[in-house]
Amino acid sequence: MKLSMITCTGTGTIGEYTVTKETTMKQIDTTQLDAAACQAQAAEYHARGFNCAQAVACTLAPAVGLDPQVAFTLTEGFGAGMGGMTETCGAISGAVAIMGFVMSDGMENPKTKGQTYKLSREIAKRFGEKNTTTVCGTLKGIGSDKGPLRSCPGCIDDAIEIACDVLKQLAE
């Protein structure tokens, strides 16, 4: 697979985080980041049996030059809150996996992870603000008399919307 690369320098603010773009970042095709279209694609994937992480990552993969099949296999264990443990929502994990792919310079330069962490925190922060939590079990209402706070399809929609916004900001 051939990846398109762009060299980015400078800084930008995404949410409360300043992201330093001094890395060779994967090219982001913003024409593939229409949130409504991405949400529809992710919903189709989820309806076919993809877990929440897979639905998000496979939907966003083409926009960043990642093979959706690779995204699918890499995120298989992140569903149902990390391997069924109902911890961090899989939809968030799928979005974070895409940010890692975009920002990482690879094994030769492991110093890019700090920038990826900032983007990961921004995604989790926005998701938590929208849903009051990032924990799968709490979102699903497991162990609660109140029922679910947000359905899996709703969580996928939210993660897609947030990730599309962050990716568009990175591409600016």
Predicted regions and their residues:
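Acidic-glycine-rich active-site phosphate/pyrophosphate-binding loop
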Residues: 26-32, 59-77, 130-137
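DPxDG-like acidic metal-binding loop motif
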Residues: 94-102
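Phosphate-handling active-site elements
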Residues: 63-74, 101-119
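Polybasic, low-complexity association/targeting segments
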Residues: 24-48
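A short glycine/serine-rich beta->alpha loop
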Residues: 40-47, 78-86, 143-149
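Short, Lys/Arg-enriched N-terminal segments with co-localized hydrophobic residues
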Residues: 2, 12-24
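C-terminal binding/interaction regions
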Residues: 115-172
